[in-house]
């Protein structure tokens, strides 16, 4: 037991230090002091290589700053809150392409002019998360009103009439459902219902619907999690149907774990650990080089995506969350061993000790393929969310294992630290 505490404490300290370094990187390099919002196209050293602004990443960074400000005393600092508010105001002014219509741009120019619109719900989802978190830290009702109005629109698009997304219904296209849509909605249900029993009650049916839609992606007699299924929960033909994304399954796993825990459903919790944690990990871990494959084919055929064998930052971040959460809830040492396995690989391969933050894209053998720290798809989100959640879970585990007096002698880092020695 003492050795276990020492290992957990060492990882807690390591994760906390890394969170400080990651936050410092974004504080130093991403803020647009002139136009508002954030730069996310950042090179290895934080230099801006493109000033386009991606709405979903703007929303993610606002959410992340607010969450850190709200949940960690050492991040309760004016510079984080002010940057989050500036990012939120940038979104309020520019995210929606043609107000009062709710559709948000995917890409904006630096000064907020729309460049591209995606026919999906994801910019709108992260807009909603940002507004709700801003309301929680500021008390400004404008933000919550925006969040609730956008949530209503998203639910309408998903469950009633998708025509507002602008996707044509082509006769040859299969009626498919990506796991990403119910995952994202379940995340929003939890976000909006936090500490609000009335709203949580109203949205309970939506949460149940989302969970059931995610669970139907377990196919082939429980032997595979497929990224796409038909609208009635059946396997699709061809590459689309065989497509697997281990990192996405693991992220869905911890979303479902929290759902099961909130409902006190031990049977569902066990099912989720088996099918959404252990199954995608064991099938998705590269036995030769380590790390999680980005994409797989359920029949073992060669995936068509050029990046299928690469190792990306976010699946490993989500795996760390999933397995530490699974261990926290069950005490199963096998889950803790996998957390350590993933965390060691992740810290060794993705972490940049010289400039801070993590590399996002590795070749199959674990060597850095792209030196950028941010871009159209990587911003201030998966890495700090992973580190923040893992720090909290490790603290809670140590509190359960050790006397409070022993923990009180160890304080977390004083604040964000700049790149240097770990």
UniProtKB/Swiss-Prot annotation:
Its EC number is 5.1.3.8. It catalyses: an N-acyl-D-glucosamine = an N-acyl-D-mannosamine. GO terms for molecular function: identical protein binding; N-acylglucosamine 2-epimerase activity; peptidase inhibitor activity. Residues 185-206 are annotated as: Leucine-zipper. GO terms for biological process: carbohydrate metabolic process; N-acetylglucosamine metabolic process; N-acetylmannosamine metabolic process; N-acetylneuraminate catabolic process. SUPFAM superfamilies: Six-hairpin glycosidases. The record marks 380 as: Important for enzyme activity. Transmembrane segments: none annotated. Pathway: Amino-sugar metabolism; N-acetylneuraminate degradation. InterPro entries: 6-hairpin_glycosidase_sf, 6hp_glycosidase-like_sf, AGE/CE, AGE_dom. Keywords: Isomerase. Catalyzes the interconversion of N-acetylglucosamine to N-acetylmannosamine. Involved in the N-glycolylneuraminic acid (Neu5Gc) degradation pathway. Homodimer. Forms a heterodimer with renin and inhibits its activity. Belongs to the N-acylglucosamine 2-epimerase family. This is N-acylglucosamine 2-epimerase. It comes from Bos taurus. The gene is RENBP.
């Amino acid at each position: 037991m003492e050795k276990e505490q020492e290992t957990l404490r060492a990882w807690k300290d390591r994760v906390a230090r890394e969170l400080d370094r990651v936050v410092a990187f974004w504080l130093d390099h991403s803020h647009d002091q002139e136009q508002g919002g954030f730069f996310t196209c950042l090179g290895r050293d934080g230099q801006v290589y493109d000033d386009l602004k991606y709405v979903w990443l703007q929303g993610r960074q606002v959410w992340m700053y607010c969450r850190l400000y709200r949940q960690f005393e050492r991040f309760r600092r004016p510079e984080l809150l002010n940057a989050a508010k500036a990012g939120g105001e940038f979104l309020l002014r520019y995210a929606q392409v043609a107000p009062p219509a709710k559709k948000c741009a995917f890409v904006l120019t630096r000064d907020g002019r729309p460049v591209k619109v995606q026919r999906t719900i994801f910019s709108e989802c992260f807009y909603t998360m940002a507004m709700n978190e801003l309301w929680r830290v500021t008390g400004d009702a404008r933000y919550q009103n925006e969040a609730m109005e956008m949530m209503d629109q998203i639910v309408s698009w998903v469950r009633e009439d998708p025509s507002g997304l602008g996707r044509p219904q082509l006769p040859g296209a299969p009626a498919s459902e990506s796991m990403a849509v119910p995952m994202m909605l379940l995340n929003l249900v939890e976000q909006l219902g936090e500490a609000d029993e009335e709203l949580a009650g109203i949205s309970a049916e939506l949460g149940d619907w989302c969970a059931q839609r995610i669970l139907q992606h377990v196919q082939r007699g429980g032997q595979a999690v497929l990224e796409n299924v038909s609208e009635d929960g059946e396997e699709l033909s061809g590459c689309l149907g065989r497509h697997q994304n281990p990192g996405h399954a693991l992220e869905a796993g911890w979303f479902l774990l929290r759902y099961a825990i909130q409902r006190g459903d031990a049977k569902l919790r066990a099912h989720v650990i088996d099918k959404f944690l252990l199954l995608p990990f064991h099938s998705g871990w590269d036995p030769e080089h380590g790390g999680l494959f980005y994409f797989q084919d359920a029949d073992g055929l060669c995936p068509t995506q050029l990046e299928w064998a690469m190792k990306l930052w976010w699946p490993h971040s989500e795996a760390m969350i999933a397995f530490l959460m699974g261990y926290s809830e069950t005490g199963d040492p096998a889950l803790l061993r996998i957390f350590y396995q993933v965390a060691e690989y992740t810290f060794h391969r993705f972490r940049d000790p010289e400039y801070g933050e993590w590399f996002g894209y590795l070749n199959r053998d674990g060597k850095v393929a792209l030196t950028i720290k941010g871009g159209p798809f990587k911003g201030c989100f998966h890495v700090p969310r992973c580190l923040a959640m893992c720090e909290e879970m490790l603290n809670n585990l140590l509190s359960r294992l050790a006397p409070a007096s022993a923990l009180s002698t160890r304080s977390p880092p004083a604040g964000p630290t700049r790149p240097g020695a770990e």
